[in-house]
């Protein structure tokens, strides 16, 4: 597998878990704990896909999503959320988010979703 994935979540454990899963799949992965780190990585490393938590202190998921799209219109985004933030999720989907996973998510489902999205590009 090829492709670059950015994991954006303020929870260290989630970032590490997804990092390990996607690295085993052969993807190059980047991690960000907040929006500022995420946008820096998007500018420097040009990831193909972002796995983005909606509830992050400081810059929230919608702000991060919009800023990522301003930097790279073609970037793909998959959302994660631990809360029933239906308004935020709908807004992100309206802006072009591919899908949403509620935490706790099934790791195999998110792995398959990423595989499917990055395979479309290849």
Curated annotation (Swiss-Prot):
The protein's Enzyme Commission number: 2.7.-.-
Residues involved in Mg(2+) binding: 9-10, 53, 55
Predominant subcellular localization, coarse grouping: cytoplasm
Signal peptide start and end residues: none
PROSITE patterns for the chain: RESPONSE_REGULATORY
SUPFAM superfamilies listed in its UniProt record: CheY-like
Keyword presence, Transport: no
Root EC class: transferase
Highest rank taxon of the organism: Bacteria
Subcellular location(s) of the protein: Cytoplasm
One annotated GO molecular function: kinase activity
Keywords, comma-separated and alphabetical: Cytoplasm, Kinase, Magnesium, Metal-binding, Phosphoprotein, Sporulation, Transferase, Two-component regulatory system
Modification comment: Phosphorylated by KinA and KinB.
InterPro entries: Bact_response_regulator (IPR050595), CheY-like_superfamily (IPR011006), Sig_transdc_resp-reg_receiver (IPR001789)
Record domain Response regulatory: where: 4-118
Cofactor note: Binds 1 Mg(2+) ion per subunit.
Residues with the 4-aspartylphosphate modification: 53
Any one Gene Ontology cellular component term annotated for this protein: cytoplasm
Its biological purpose: Key element in the phosphorelay regulating sporulation initiation. Phosphorylation of spo0B during sporulation initiation.
Name of protein: Sporulation initiation phosphotransferase F
Organism: Bacillus thuringiensis subsp. kurstaki
